[in-house]
Design a protein with these regions (language model features):
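Conserved phosphate/anionic-ligand binding catalytic regions in large, soluble enzymes, centered on
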Residues: 27-29, 122-140, 328-351, 432-452, ...
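Flexible, glycine/charged-enriched surface loops at secondary-structure junctions
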Residues: 103-109, 144-146, 213-231, 262-263, ...
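Mobile "lid/hinge" segments at catalytic clefts and subdomain interfaces of large enzymes
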Residues: 140-258, 447-543
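Long, basic N-terminal domains or extensions that often function
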Residues: 1-232
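Single-stranded RNA-binding regions, centering on S1/OB-family and related RNA-binding modules
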Residues: 550-552, 559-696
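Extended amphipathic alpha-helical scaffolds
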Residues: 1-45, 229-367, 550-564, 572, ...
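Glycine-rich, flexible beta-strand/loop modules in the N-terminal catalytic cores of phosphate-handling
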Residues: 25-110, 115-117, 122, 188, ...
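Long, charged amphipathic helices and adjacent flexible linkers at domain junctions
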Residues: 227-238, 529-555, 603-623
Length: 696
């Protein structure tokens, strides 16, 4: 039965409709917020997927170009694979809903958010997140929701929920917060060197509104929600768990606590293999249960030892950061490079500089924009010793690249300060946790090595959380095992002054303000330590660009002179390009960017542009070229497209009968501007200069 529910959210109506669309899904809602409308449908398989050892949840976010009245590009004029924006939005929805499913669930669950209509003030991804929660909540799928998400901005020193496009342009913060009525589940966002206290206040400010949306959803679920189905999960028999614990605890402890990842992984595998062989005869029908018990025991040993003894698998203290080494300028032909190694995580970051014509055009459901700073992250299989083939960047790689880009964007110089398009690629060569934050550190040094005048160095650190028996431990610079077996992955990147980017994912049902505050403070201390290590390698941007980088000169011309520089059919600008070899980009606001690998060529092109737009002034002297001879004088081009007349009486000191007695077409002569009449005609004199020379 069709029903509509409404609440006010940030001064605008939030409407959730049920029972009208996608009625064959387990649960479906249409979320309206302003003129934004997103349909979210959730389905679940009736039976568990056989042979699966993970929870098979898939979230798809489908951007339809008709939602903003655009025609899809390409020959087929049809939406294809999801773009970067859609993938990042899908991740944003996935992360807060995933922890609230039973991790033992093996039924396929598919959440599809389809964007049907968009206005630029109301974010469809937030509607998708609320819709995902509501659609699961009213379905028969067991789940511990609801959750909700909001965006928090900071305008004129005040926090704003779901800022409009105009407010967002003035905001110094852009943080998406998701959570349940009880706790925070996910954080994703950026700021401009914000103090940790401001970031925490923004998160908690957002949570107050999240509570209201969750209560709103609970009313909907009470009224139209289906009865939840009962899922049964295989349990490891208590006897097997007890026997495995007795047999394998000591061997696993010895294997787990080793500073070297590869050796540790090998020792753990050997200990598990020995246990499996031992129990093969005792429990031949329950070997999968034995394997599950071994995995559970490994996790419990790690977590218990950290929270009760303060010892981590590699022997570090809770706040200790792995050894760091840095190197810059490794690659001779690239414009900038740096190698950042932290423990067994290593990132090679390469910077490329290009003319402004190389900006990336972003054409999705948002207004068309251009990006001049691009950060990309690659995670090849060899970095973790695996043999998977390369299939292009996946969701994780796109997410990590976006996080690193957000961390560095606030320190990138403006186009007026540095008129280059900047691309940084982070190649992860080794990974044992925190690779996205290693890419932030490596990219900072690569940018400085390239000579990009960044405003301040940026470093990143990943924090972890272990909750056990009512106690919690915050871990600095988590490694792979701590990420896999822990309860939180909390990435914080910024300068010495404050936070630029933040990302938090959890595996529990939420975390408190106290945990967040402790993690942020500990991250600040770790970030300062890492920045100090980076400064030992490179502490300021290089004074000169690489000799292989393009030399770019910028200047501004009057807007009404743009057509003069371009010329009819591009004739003038193409002439400059052919004569100098430089590349010219002319913007609508009159900014001109000249790029060339040869500095002299760029300067020559600049001089040619300046001569085109220069205004003729009375009293100024010019070297001109004779273009035409008439009975009454000679026409001389003193600037491109600017001709004046030297009357026959002004050609020489003596009387001249015919102009051709003194000059010929093509001759270059010095002339002085004596008058510009009310019709714009320019009168020139050669005689005046000859008199000046004679009288000296």
């Amino acid at each position: 039965m069709f029903k509509t529910f409404e609440m006010e959210l940030a001064g605008r109506p939030l409407i959730i409709e049920t029972g009208k669309m996608a009625k064959q899904a387990n649960g479906a809602v249409l979320v309206r917020y302003g003129d934004t409308a997103v349909l979210v449908a959730t389905t679940a398989s009736k039976e568990p997927r056989e042979g699966t050892d993970f929870f098979p949840l898939t979230v798809d976010y489908e951007e339809k170009m008709y939602a903003v009245g655009k025609m899809p590009g390409g020959f087929l004029r049809r939406e294809g694979r999801p773009g970067n924006s859609a993938i990042l939005c899908a991740r944003l929805i996935d992360r807060p809903i995933r922890p609230l499913f039973d991790k033992r669930c093996r039924n396929d669950i598919h959440v599809v958010a389809t964007v049907l209509s968009v206005d630029y003030d109301n974010a469809p991804e937030l509607c998708g997140m609320i819709g995902a929660s509501a659609s699961i909540g009213i379905s028969d799928i067991p789940w511990d929701g609801p959750i909700a998400g909001v965006r928090v901005g900071r305008v004129d020193g005040k926090y704003v929920i779901n800022p409009t496009q105009e407010e967002m342009a003035a905001s110094t913060m852009n943080v998406t917060v998701a959570g349940s009525e009880e706790a925070i589940m996910m954080v994703e966002g950026g700021a401009q060197e914000a103090p940790e206290e401001e970031v925490l206040d923004a998160i908690m400010f957002g949570h107050e509104t999240i509570k209201e949306i969750c209560r709103f959803q609970k009313k909907i679920i009470e009224e139209v929600g289906k009865e939840k189905r009962v899922l049964t999960f295989p349990e490891v028999p208590a006897e097997i768990e007890k026997d495995v614990e007795a047999f394998a605890t000591e061997s696993l402890k010895k294997a787990i606590f080793d500073a070297d990842k590869l050796r540790r992984d090998g020792n753990i595998a050997a200990a598990k293999k020995a246990a499996m062989e031992h129990f093969a005869e005792i429990y031949p029908e329950h070997l999968s249960d034995v394997a599950d018990a071994l995995d559970h025991l490994t996790k419990e040993i790690v977590r218990h030892t950290i929270t009760n003894e303060g010892i981590r698998p590699d022997g570090r203290k809770l706040t200790e950061i792995r050894p760091i080494t840095c190197e810059v300028g490794l690659l001779p032909r690239v414009h900038g490079s740096a190698l950042f190694t932290r423990g067994q995580t290593q990132a090679l970051s390469i910077t490329t500089l290009a003319p402004m014509s190389e900006t990336q055009i972003i054409d999705d459901l948002t207004p068309v924009t251009e990006k001049r700073y691009i950060h990309q992250y690659n995670f090849p299989s060899y970095c973790v010793g695996e043999t998977k083939g390369s299939r292009g960047p996946g969701r994780r790689e796109l997410g990590h690249g976006a996080l690193a880009e957000r961390a560095l964007l606030p320190v990138i110089p403006s186009v007026d300060e540095f008129p280059y398009v900047i691309r940084v690629v982070s190649e992860i060569l080794e990974s044992n946790g925190s690779s996205s934050q290693a890419s932030v550190c490596g990219s900072t040094m690569s940018l400085m090595n390239a000579g990009v005048p960044i405003k301040a160095p940026v470093a990143g650190i990943a924090m972890g959380l272990i909750e056990d028996g009512g106690k919690f431990s915050i871990l600095s610079d988590i490694q792979g095992m701590e990420d896999a077996l822990g309860d939180m992955d909390f990435k914080v990147a910024g300068t010495a002054k404050g936070v630029n980017a933040i990302q938090m994912d959890i595996k529990v049902h939420g975390i408190s303000r106290d945990i967040l505050l402790t993690a942020l403070k500990q991250a600040h201390e770790g970030r300062l330590y890492i920045l100090g290590k980076m400064a030992e390698c490179i502490d300021k941007p290089a004074e000169h660009l690489s000799k292989y980088a393009p030399k770019i000169i910028s200047l501004t011309i009057p807007v009404d002179k743009i057509r003069v520089v371009i010329g009819s059919g591009g004739k003038t600008i193409n002439k400059i390009i052919s004569e100098t070899g430089a590349k010219l980009d002319v913007e609508e606001d009159g900014r001109v960017y000249i790029a060339s690998e040869d500095e002299a060529a760029a300067q020559k092109a600049k001089a040619m542009v300046e001569s085109l737009v220069k205004e003729v002034e009375v009293g100024e002297t010019y070297l001109g070229r004779v273009t035409r001879l008439m009975k009454f004088g000679a026409f001389v081009e003193i600037l491109p497209g600017k001709e004046g007349l030297v009357h026959v009486s002004q050609l020489a000191l003596q009387r001249v009968e015919k102009p051709e007695d003194i000059v010929h077409e093509g001759d270059e002569i010095m002339v002085k501007v004596t008058e510009i009449d009310d019709k714009g005609r320019i009168n020139l004199s050669r005689k005046a200069l000859l008199l000046e020379k004679k009288n000296k």
